[in-house]
Amino acid sequence: MQSGNKFTTFWFNGQKYLSQDMEFTIFDLLNYFDYNPSLLVVEYNNSILIKKNWNKIVILNNDKIEVLTIVGGG
């Protein structure tokens, strides 16, 4: 019997990532990369996500996540 290694390939801000044997949410990913959630807009598979759903959506194989940072200026 082969080991149960499960790989998930996903795209984050245009870069390809590979995760092994780990399930994580959009919120987990943002924390890992040290983003400040109060200043972000997240696009998930070409749709803008509501912030309250970031902790509910588990990243799946071939998902595409883009993070837009809001900055002030004049």
What are these regions (language model features)?
Residues 1-73:
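Ubiquitin-like/PB1-type beta-grasp interaction modules and other compact soluble beta-rich domains
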